[in-house]
Amino acid sequence: MTWLSEKVGDAVSVDGVFKDVQNLGNSGYFSEVNPVFTSVPEGVKIDFAVVTNPVVHGVVFEGNSVYTSDVLTKYMAIPEGQIMNSVYVGQKVQGINAAYARDGYMLAHVDGIAVDGNGMIHIHIVEGIVEDIVPAGNKKTRNKVITREFVQKTGKPFNKFLVRRSVERVYNLGFFDDVNVRMLPGEKDPNNVIIEIDVLEHKTGTITLGAGYSKSDGLMGIVEFGEDNLRGT
């Protein structure tokens, strides 16, 4: 077996046995590998007690809403009727994570893999749901004025492209000098996210001072005050 470096007639090496255990584990076909040493007249006999992974009979996806299970199945492409190879499954899972990231769902990822007694592989996905959108730093502008510009919606998976467009829409209102986003852990679920939209309102008030003169009123002052973002509407 090519996974084993220890040969009959060789002196037993702890490092060699450890390497063989690693090689067997890294093959992907076994969930457990344990060396068993037995004394024999010729020296020491080494057996490797292994627990073989189950035969695959199908894949079930849980927690996915962005992509259908049919789409995700194409990414997995795990042959049925064969022993599950955990290394191969791990590589395919990375393909799913990459697909989410490519489309802007930067918080989505495969969170767990389990195999039931029927040989069904359960792939659990968390998609980073937006729990809430909370404005901050706005003293004159109402919250709804900010949140209504968001194309990223609560209850939906976080998408960096939608958030970027939302920030641009808020900035284009013309009320703010700066608009930034902070992501906070969800309160209902740690896999969720709360978006804090932090704004810096610019000084919209203008004051004009002047003086004039009329024969009837004499010297008079002129004071004008203007407010662009009146009542934050």
What are the functions of these language-model segments?
Residues 230-233:
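Short loop/turn motifs that connect adjacent beta-strands in outer-membrane beta-barrel proteins
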